[in-house]
């Protein structure tokens, strides 16, 4: 069940159902390389009139994303393993931030038990700085 009534906090890790690609590549569905499927996300802002700003978390390394400073590594110890999500290094993809409806967001469960997880503040700060780079506003960052 989606998080309709839950007020997520910055740094909270949830699951987002981005949906699937449209079979016809029509603009009414997702088009590659847009984000699809259910995946972990980190909450960046939950005060957007019913929308939640999130950044997706991926287990696939992208060297260009790392080199450009858009992908922030998350140590395998920061995300609890569940029956679905194994323990591995992951990356937050800051160039793929998106505002999504609460109806797309779900709590993470393991064997029927809800898991509440938050990234440390220093990791969230790295993500926020990477987003500034991704929107081509690096001049706003302290050198």
Swiss-Prot record:
Record lineage: Bacteria, Pseudomonadati, Pseudomonadota, Gammaproteobacteria, Pasteurellales
Superkingdom field: Bacteria
Gene3D superfamilies given in the database record: 2.30.30.110
GO terms for MF: DNA binding
Protein known as: Uncharacterized protein HI_0080
Pfam families for the chain: PemK_toxin
Family recorded in the similarity comment: To E.coli YifN.
